[in-house]
């Protein structure tokens, strides 16, 4: 049985376009094989921005922590445990002001940890999370794929690659604010991409 971690970053929760697409993908995946799904709504999780105080707890022994320090350490430790036990990561990724949502950046700051998910070596960083697959469902009001304005794709490939995850797949749902006809066509194309992905996921 595969463990599937679903991370939704839309401000609209389950009503967001990217969240709807991750839901459709997981539903279809459940029909093809036995999976265990762990779902995280990053908007309601309400992670604070990473602070120096929280980062300091990562190098502390749990027995030496105060209650407040233990609570800060738990942010990263719990998210890391979810990521490490997952086989497949499914991400609902809207675009806000040409970049990723701040809630997803807060998640990245907790899981991209030197000494845990990657290490620095004389030959450069070495990731520790090989063998996982990522599917990113990128919903956008305009059309950015393949242009300099698409900052998400290279950044997310870079940060997952840092952790050793190189099988990163993007499904684009673009032009959603460019008229009903264009949006419908984009949805159709995205759903067709789902059926193509499923055989490779099983």
Swiss-Prot record:
Keywords: Flavoprotein, FMN, NAD, Oxidoreductase. This is FMN-dependent NADH:quinone oxidoreductase. Belongs to the azoreductase type 1 family. It is an enzyme of class 1 (oxidoreductase). It comes from the Bacteria. Its cofactor is FMN. GO terms for molecular function: electron transfer activity; FMN binding; oxidoreductase activity, acting on NAD(P)H as acceptor; oxidoreductase activity, acting on NAD(P)H, quinone or similar compound as acceptor. It catalyses: 2 a quinone + NADH + H(+) = 2 a 1,4-benzosemiquinone + NAD(+); N,N-dimethyl-1,4-phenylenediamine + anthranilate + 2 NAD(+) = 2-(4-dimethylaminophenyl)diazenylbenzoate + 2 NADH + 2 H(+). Gene3D superfamilies: 3.40.50.360. Pfam families: Flavodoxin_2. Quinone reductase that provides resistance to thiol-specific stress caused by electrophilic quinones. Homodimer. SUPFAM superfamilies: Flavoproteins. The keyword Flavoprotein applies. FMN binds at residues 10, 95-98. The keyword DNA-binding does not apply. Its EC number is 1.6.5.-, 1.7.1.17. Binds 1 FMN per subunit.
């Amino acid at each position: 049985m595969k463990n599937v971690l679903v991370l939704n970053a839309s401000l609209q929760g389950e009503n967001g376009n990217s969240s709807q697409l991750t839901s459709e993908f997981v539903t279809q995946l459940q029909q093809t094989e036995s999976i265990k799904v762990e779902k995280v709504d990053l908007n309601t999780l309400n992670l604070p921005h990473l602070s120096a105080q929280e980062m300091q707890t990562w190098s502390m022994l749990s027995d030496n922590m105060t209650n407040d320090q233990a609570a800060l350490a738990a942010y990263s430790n719990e998210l890391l445990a979810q990521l490490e036990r997952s086989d497949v990561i499914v991400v609902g990724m809207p675009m806000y002001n040409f970049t990723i949502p701040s809630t997803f950046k807060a998640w990245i700051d907790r899981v991209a940890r030197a000494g845990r998910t990657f290490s620095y070596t004389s030959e450069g960083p070495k990731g520790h999370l090989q063998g996982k697959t990522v599917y990113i469902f990128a919903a956008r009001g305009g059309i950015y794929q393949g242009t300099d304005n698409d900052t998400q794709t290279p950044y997310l490939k870079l940060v997952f690659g840092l952790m050793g995850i190189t099988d990163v797949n993007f499904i684009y749902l673009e032009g959603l604010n460019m008229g009903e006809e264009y949006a419908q066509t984009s949805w159709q194309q995205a759903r067709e991409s789902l059926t193509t992905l499923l055989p490779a996921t099983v």
